Amino acid sequence: PTDYSHIDIIPANGYLMKTDMNLLLKSEDNQVTRLREALEEVSDAYDYCICDCGRLLDMVVINILIAAELVIAPVKVGGYEIEALQNLEEQIEDLRDINPDLRIKALMTMRQKNKTSLEVEEWLKTESGFDMFVTPIRRSIIAEKSTTAMIPLPKFSKRGIVSQDYRCVVHELLKEMEE
């Protein structure tokens, strides 16, 4: 339960590490499809399920990738973003037998209007072969302050540029889901 109606959140904290360990220890069950099976049981209660996870390919992340339809891959310009995106694509390819419909869509984050950022964004759009959100998420100190304060961005700064950017991304995503 949260302060927001119709939204439930399972935080990515130490509980997930324990869940990963428990999944590994339960060798008699099919560990990699546990989340997909659990989500099927509650599918009437939710329109969407968003799982925030790190890049470490542990059992929890594998479960998420197998249950997912779409991976939104944040890309922050910093030197390793292209390699990280390619690694993610390879990891997803390894899971195609179990989840053949899983897609990746890149989301440019922490975007600045400098030459490097614009070059990476252009490469992603034109040469990378990755599907990409039209709206980039601009860099703003407000987003960092919101994270530090542990307050959701729209509550911390309702009219800020980053809140507006994320709303645009959500609208893009909802429009895509309707098609």
Kindly label every feature range from the protein language model.
Residues 23, 35, 143, 153-156:
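Short clusters of hydrophobic/aromatic residues that line enzyme substrate/ligand-binding pockets
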Residues 15-16, 139-143:
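Active-site/binding-pocket entry motifs
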Residues 40-135, 141:
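Conserved catalytic-core segment of NTP-binding enzymes
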Residues 173-179:
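Short, hydrophobic alpha-helical segments
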Residues 166-173:
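Hydrophobic "lid"/C-terminal helical patch
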Residues 146-165:
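C-terminal boundary of histidine-terminating zinc-finger modules
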Residues 28, 81-84, 162:
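Short, conserved glycine- and acidic-residue-centered signature motifs
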Residues 1-57:
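Cytosolic-facing regulatory segments adjacent to core modules
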